[in-house]
């Protein structure tokens, strides 16, 4: 059974090819000798016309190249022009316009975000500088052990100077009072020294 089916499969293509050949033979056999001659003449004419058209096309292409060379249009310029034209056509499409608008909007958002970050950083540095200056001038610093030690030494030194100069206030005082007293005592000492110098000059 399988051998018979295979035989049928093998014979069918052959029968089809034979049918085509028979059809061609039948079609050509239907033409008369006069019609065959007319078709052959028409075939020759068509081939001649195609050859002539190819020659004309080749001549036109050569003439086109000559004109472009005279106008200074080379292949690179043509490519640039084609690219520019294609780019312009692409920019006018709706998809490109939507994409361009989306990217522009995103760029504006990014720029605004960077500006906000820069402003925040500048403000933070300004607050830090103010905090440092404020902390230096705060009373808490004057209450530190280092500043108190320095203040006590200054008061002690000034008190000893006042004792030598002849001041009456030996009770210390605040740091500002000590500084004022020292300045006053120094001016008195300078005045006494100048009077003593004048007296010596008069005695001479």
Swiss-Prot record:
Compositionally biased intervals (Polar residues): 179-195
Pfam family, one: TPD52
Positions bearing Phosphoserine: 29, 86, 122, 131, 149, 174
GO cellular component: cytoplasm; early endosome; perinuclear region of cytoplasm
Keywords: Coiled coil, Methylation, Phosphoprotein
InterPro entries: TPD52 (IPR007327)
GO biological processes: G2/M transition of mitotic cell cycle
Segments forming a coiled coil: 22-73
Omega-N-methylarginine: residues carrying this PTM: 133
Region called Disordered, residue ranges: 1-31, 164-204
Modified residues (Phosphothreonine): 146
Keyword Ligase: no
MF (Gene Ontology): protein homodimerization activity
Subunit structure: Forms a homodimer or heterodimer with other members of the family.
Sequence similarity: Belongs to the TPD52 family.
The protein's name: Tumor protein D53
Species assigned in the record: Mus musculus (Mouse)
């Amino acid at each position: 059974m399988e051998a018979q089916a295979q035989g049928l499969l093998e014979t069918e293509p052959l029968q089809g090819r034979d049918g085509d050949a028979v059809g061609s033979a039948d079609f050509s056999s239907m033409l008369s000798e006069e019609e065959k001659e007319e078709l052959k003449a028409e075939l020759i004419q068509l081939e001649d016309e195609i050859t002539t058209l190819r020659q004309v096309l080749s001549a036109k292409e050569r003439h086109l190249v000559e004109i472009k060379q005279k106008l200074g249009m080379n292949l690179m310029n043509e490519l640039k022009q084609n690219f520019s034209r294609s780019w312009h056509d692409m920019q006018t499409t709706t998809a490109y316009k939507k994409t361009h608008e989306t990217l522009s909007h995103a760029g504006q958002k990014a720029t605004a975000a960077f500006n906000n970050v820069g402003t925040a950083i500048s403000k933070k540095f300004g607050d830090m500088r103010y905090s440092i200056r404020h902390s230096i001038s705060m009373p808490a610093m004057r209450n530190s052990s280092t500043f108190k030690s320095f203040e006590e030494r200054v008061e002690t030194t000034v008190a000893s100077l006042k004792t030598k100069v002849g001041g009456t206030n030996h009770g210390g005082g605040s740091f500002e009072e000590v500084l004022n007293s020292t300045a006053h005592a120094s001016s008195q000492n300078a005045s006494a020294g100048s009077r003593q110098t004048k007296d010596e000059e008069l005695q001479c």
